Regions:
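Solvent-exposed, low-complexity, repeat-rich "mucin-like" stalks and linkers
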Residues: 48-72, 219-222, 226, 231
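Short, surface-exposed loop/turn segments at beta-strand-coil junctions that are enriched for proline
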Residues: 67-69, 146-153
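Glycoside hydrolase catalytic-domain groove-lining segments
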Residues: 325, 385-412
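Aromatic-lined carbohydrate-binding surfaces of glycoside hydrolases
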Residues: 130, 146, 157-164, 171-369, ...
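C-terminal motif of bacterial Sec signal peptides marking the signal peptidase cleavage site
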Residues: 14-15
Length: 412
């Protein structure tokens, strides 16, 4: 009898078998609009064909999750091919979605706001293979397929594969994905799109994987070029550059001279990249204290060979002398070197009703030196004595002053 029980037990064990690597991994295509959180464990299957116009981007999202750690993950996509064997002349891009922790939620959130229990939200896409994922944590994978404007209409199919290791075992998971291209060509966007960026040493160090970058070195300029190319991909066409940061100054007996070579090189890089529909001049003033404090302009000064921006009241001798020379020089240089580039100058960011007086004083002084210069600003109030040429209100302030801003639009 014991032998019979033992035989039955062995039969049951052998029938169950050893679970394969694939059995321990959840791998699903999901809706690109689905927010996959770190703690997500249910992925509604999504097998839709993505529909796009020529000139548009098709996007796909996959999610992977396992009971054991995953290592050395790599994602690949084969060429998209239609039934006639014609391939889309594009290079699909893959990336692993990373997360950013939100320490404080927005007050008065929408009723349908999607909340992450961990407070980690998907944001950057890391276009680099070799990623690792801890056990029981979801990892979304993003695929972007640029469709050429001359693409032939029809349905194109490709295979997405995810390779990696779980424990000592390697695995490869595959899914077919498809794109339907309609006989419509998507025109280039005509919106004005700005994405502010910084090239200060601390920012460039982050971009360079934690390694220091000498300002204006060969590596620095290579990274600026990469940044310009990336902004082109994202349809940015308005670039913010700080004249005070990139222009060199020399003062002798109260008279200034200006070296525009680095500033011009920055402009040239973004101009060649095709992202310079308009140039924003970075802010020349800032708050002197807390949020409600008054504004004061910056005046450059060199200490031990390094440029330092020092704030002085607008009515001070230092500020008046510097900007009386700098603004006309800047305007004349831009007109001569870049006659086709639209230029708008920021004064100070987001003026409010508390610091209107100092903001208007600085803006009026700038206008007095160069009446043709355009002033652009993100603003919390429209009570700025009509000193702005380009108003950029936050949406809530746009709602409050809707009639005012509509009137500005009518006036051009």
């Amino acid at each position: 009898m014991k032998n019979l029980y033992l035989i039955c037990l062995l039969f049951i064990i052998s029938a169950c078998g050893t679970p394969t690597t694939e059995d321990r991994i959840t791998f699903s295509q999901v809706d690109p609009f689905l927010k996959v959180f770190r703690e997500s464990n249910f992925f509604p299957e999504y097998n839709e064909t993505e529909e796009v116009a020529a000139g548009e981007h098709a996007t796909f999202q996959f999610a992977v999750r396992a009971a054991l750690p995953l290592k050395e993950l790599s994602a690949q996509v084969t060429a998209f091919t239609n039934e006639k064997g014609t391939q889309l002349q594009s290079s699909p891009r893959t990336g692993f979605v990373d997360y950013v922790r939100v320490g404080r939620q927005t007050p008065d959130r929408a009723k349908d706001a999607i909340t992450s229990l961990s407070h980690y939200y998907p944001d950057p896409i890391i276009e680099q293979n070799g990623q690792s994922v801890t056990r029981d944590v979801a990892q979304p994978i993003w695929i972007s397929v640029p469709v050429p404007t001359n693409a032939e209409a029809g349905t194109y199919k490709a295979t997405f594969s995810l390779k990696g290791k779980m424990g000592n075992q390697t695995f490869e998971l595959k899914k077919e994905i498809s794109v339907k291209v309609y006989p419509i060509v998507m025109p280039q966007p005509d919106l004005w799109v700005t994405n502010w960026f910084g090239t200060s040493p601390d920012k460039m160090k982050i971009f360079n994987g934690g390694k220091e970058v000498e300002p204006y070195s060969d590596v620095y300029w290579e990274m600026v070029q990469e940044l310009a190319d990336k902004m082109k991909e994202c349809y940015s066409n308005v670039i913010l550059l700080s004249p005070l940061e990139h222009i060199e100054f020399e003062e002798k007996d109260g008279t200034y001279t200006f070296d525009y070579s680095r500033f011009d090189k920055m402009i040239d890089i973004f101009h060649r990249a095709g992202v310079l529909k308009m140039l924003e001049g970075g802010h020349i003033a800032g708050r002197t204290g807390d949020w409600s404090s008054q504004f004061a302009p910056y005046v450059p000064r060199y200490e031990n060979g390094k440029k330092k921006l020092v704030q002085y009241p607008m009515e001070s001798e230092q500020a008046v002398n510097f900007y009386r020379q700098f603004i006309p020089s800047l305007a004349a240089h831009l007109k001569e070197a870049y006659p086709k580039v639209l230029y708008a100058q920021h004064i100070a960011d987001e003026p409010t009703s508390d610091n209107i007086k100092s903001y208007v004083a600085i803006a009026r002084f700038v206008k007095q030196q160069c009446p043709d210069i355009k002033i652009i600003e993100a603003c919390h109030t429209h009570d700025l004595e009509n000193i702005l040429d380009i108003w950029v209100p936050q949406l809530n302030f746009y709602k409050e002053g809707y009639d005012f801003y509509r009137e500005r639009q009518k006036q051009g």
